Amino acid sequence: MSYTIIRPKDRREWLRHRENGIGSSEVGTILGLNPYETPYQLWRRKKGLDAPKVENFAMRAGHYLEDAVSLFYRDETGKEIIKASAGDWLIVNNEKEYLRVSPDRTYWIPGRPKSDRNKGILECKTTQMEVDGDSLPQHWFCQLQYQLGVAELEQGAIAWLTMGREFGYRDLAFDKEFYDYMIEEVDRFWIDNIVGGIEPLAINVDDVLLKNPRHIIGKTVEADEELAQSCAELKEIKEELSALDTRKKDIENAIKMALGDAEALVAPGSSLAKPTILATWKAAKDSTKFDEKRFAAEKPELYAGYQYTVPGSRRFLLK
């Protein structure tokens, strides 16, 4: 075996170990296949420029529900989940220590002797989206293939629980050609971007704002024909939207005029017992608001003590 298994004493230590390399959940990001994070954002986090991800409720729930997902998989397939695989542990490549994975669960491959080589990896997911087993999210596929490669295993599966109501899974074989491609990209990212400090390119507007939160006064960029056409097209779209918004307000006001003091507008011919509601116009519940203007006037020193500066954000205007 060309890897080492690490079993940290607690979750905090496990998180520290994860920060010292590239985990399986980060590979899809490096390949540009993660819809929730870009390579530049990952780079900033790894370099300590941005705070580490804070475990939110969804992440914590997913961690707690790994047991449930693994049990569903066991019941559906009859495969034996290895109890010792639960918990926080890591597999680290001995040659490239930045290649490190933390499988959710492992299982014994049916029909084979129980040994380190005859295990499969189970990646457990909880999600709010509908999942097509024949077209898995790309970053999920990357995650499992990376785990199989680092762990030197042949088989794995992704199992998911959708909104707590639907369960699905897909068994997958290790794809060495794809794994080799991933490792080339991970090597490049680690050596050039993390160790070498080279910033990845910005691939969306969020990246641009992270790189350039303030504009350079007086600096201009000359548009090419395509960009000039884009500005003209955007101007037309804004004018169309403005006209639609005006029309929307006119129609809405006409309906409100018809309602008067009524609560609801019903369809023509609706029965009193079960009317078909077309629209309602109801008062919201009373709310309490803070009179900031009066407080500032009557308690200026106290008010000043609670003021803070918010950096100005870049505002896009079409001329």
Question: Can you name each region flagged by the protein language model?
Answer:
Residues 71, 145, 235:
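Short alpha-helical basic/polar micro-motif
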Residues 59-60, 75-103, 107-194:
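Nucleic-acid nuclease catalytic cores
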Residues 95-97, 242-319:
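Extended, charge-rich alpha-helical segments
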Residues 61-69, 178, 243, 247:
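Short amphipathic alpha-helical segments
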Residues 1-121:
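Metal-dependent nuclease catalytic cores that hydrolyze phosphodiester bonds in DNA/RNA
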